[in-house]
Each structure stands twice: as C-alpha cells, then as structure tokens.
C-alpha cells in the first residue's frame, strides 16, 4: 500500500510539473501512522521538493517542550552532572515517555526526590531524563507521560532541583556522569552531558545555566543528539 501511495505521489507531481497542472500546496509535515505508512498533518498532498524542504526545516527538538515553563521564580544556577535550578511549581515531561522511577524521599539526594522517565519519541527516544532533589512526584512507575503531564512539583526546600540525563536503567540515584567518563562525585564540576541537557532546555526557551568558565568534564556518548 505504501509503495502504491509513493507511485501515486510521484505521478501527481510529474503531472503537475510537466502537464500544466498546479501542484497542491503543502500544509503540514509527513508523520508515520500505526501501520508504518505516512499520513499528512494538514491533509494536503505535496510536491516532493516541498516535502524535503519541510523536513529540513523541522527543528531537532520537534515534539518536545520546555518542562520548566510554569516554574515560578525560575533561575538557572549551574551546570554539573545535569542542570541546577531554583524556583517553585510544576515540572512537566519534556516529551512523551514512560516513568521508570518516582520517589519523594530518602533517595540519596538533598531533598530526597527522584523521578526518571524514558523518552519514547523524538531525537532523544530511548534516553532517560531525571529530576532530583526538592521535587514531589505526581506520577507513578509505568505511567505514560506527555508534554502536558506534570511529573512533579518543586517545593521550597532550599535546594531547588537538578535535572538532566540519567543512567540508562533510570533506576540509579546517580546521573549519567560515570557512563560519560567524567570525574564522578558530588563536586560542582560542569560536565559535557550536563551541558548537552542545558542546550536542549535553551533550545526549548529555557534559561541558560552558567558553568563559571570551568572546563567541562567527561564525554558525550554518541547516542546523545545535538540541539
């Protein structure tokens, strides 16, 4: 079926280009459907050149949203294993995902909170996001989340939160730093993995966090996209 659809699309385009027919205007982008075929968002057929141009124009963060958009008094404090923020209020999922851990106390971080979820779409699909410290979970393990899901609330405990890329299992109270070849520990050292998550948040409209001119430690694994 997909093959016949492609043939029909090329035929229509050829007729439009060489038969004097005006090609319909492209009104959206192609998206995969459940059967693995393609559907249009906007409902219009397109000249293939328009499809290629539209695909190139799509941002790398398509489908993701700033998870800290509703935090009151948000302040970006520093880059370390992840990114540290001050403020109070709701934290959303950055993209579609599945919760792998959610606890509000005694998880080895200041404030005790720890939430992880594995992204299931977009360029970061398969990677695990963590939010730690002064956060009370609003989700449970196994729950599916979207960019409209509040995963937890930052409370005014004096530590704020740290958020970034977690180890692949999503179950450890350590961040991605050991896997990234960094120096480990709790020191205030900026890491390349933390900087990568900061770049993601900035691309979504979040505030940039400082690294205070320090060298970024560790490496960025190949699985991590650029933003």
Residue ranges: model-predicted function:
Residues 18-114, 146-147, 194-227:
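Surface-exposed, glycine-biased beta-strand/turn segments
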Residues 1-17:
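Single-pass alpha-helical membrane anchors
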Residues 94-138, 155-166:
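Zn2+-dependent peptidoglycan hydrolase active-site motif and core
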Residues 116-118, 143-227:
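Conserved, short, structured surface segments that act as functional micro-motifs
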Residues 86-89, 134, 140:
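A structural connector/turn signal
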Residues 10-13, 24, 118, 222:
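Compositionally biased, intrinsically disordered low-complexity segments
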Residues 1-4, 108, 154-156, 212:
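Short, surface-exposed loop and linker segments with low hydrophobicity and enrichment for Pro/Ser/Thr
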